[in-house]
Amino acid sequence: PFHVMIRLPPPGHLLTALVLFMLLIFYVDYRLPQSSTVSYGRSRITVDGGRPRIVVYNRVPKTASTTFTNAIAYDMFKENSFNVVHLNITKNRYVMSLRDQGDLVRNLTDWRERQPLFIHGHVAFIDFERFGLAPPIYINLIREPLERLLSHYYFLRYGDNYRVGLKRARAGNNETFDECISRSGHDCDPTQMWLQIPYFCGQHPFCSEIGSRQALEQAKRTLVDKYLIVGVSDRIRDTVAMLEATIPSFFRGALKHFDSLDETRAHLRNTRKKVPPSSQTLYLVHSTEVYKLEREFYDFALAHFDGLFKKATNGSGRAEDAVAMASQYHFEKIKPVNPYRTL
């Protein structure tokens, strides 16, 4: 008969080989997974590469955007290790050609040495996915439409507390908003309110059509589906808290920092003089179709933000709770003990 002889190593060598083999198994089972999963249970799970790479703040003019950008983004970039870039569009346009949109989204996506990136500028929403690229995180602030127009109207005449020595476009023109309305002036024309809807509607041609119901509905869809947080200018502290809670890699410590600012830095660009409109002016403006649509959008955005804020604070309404509240979920009944892995 045919016999197979198996030569075993000496007992000491066999024990050494067995120990080395067990160490290898331990390394593969426990060391390698740490690059992707840190912990289970009630603690957070962190994943390498999970940090957002791009945050886009397509800031609407006269909505406290300067306060937010300077007091939060430019103050926090060192502490949280991100880059800040301002997007400047020729002739202060807020819409771009399709070609420029494509160039922009590719440039931002490929600009790896400047990521993580916080980019801000006066530009209407641009859909990255339209060009086959992963979307960034979009954020924004909005303001009651007539208040925004009044702020812009008097800003052109009297400037603000941010760049005091700069002469504004209507400097020396002391006409009040009421007087402008009475003569149907250009600067107070209610069509000047048509701005927040186009900013959220996006780059489609119909978005710029003044009084377009289609633009309003598109703006609502974009706000809900494409934006992480859209706050309101008179609740900027709540907005900062929501951003810290949802994008901590960019905004960790932002609420505490905002609370530490003095009144001047916490409210940059206050228009130096504003005359409240009369009841007659309010009636005339509120009766226009443009105001009704812009106000509908504002109310929609405010209700959406309120809903998110209420959940984030568990109903307390305190900004601090949005940041400090523990996660309201955990993992359990995890099987097997050593996870299956696929390459």
PLM segments and residue spans:
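PAPS-dependent sulfotransferase catalytic domain
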Residues: 43, 88-141, 147-257
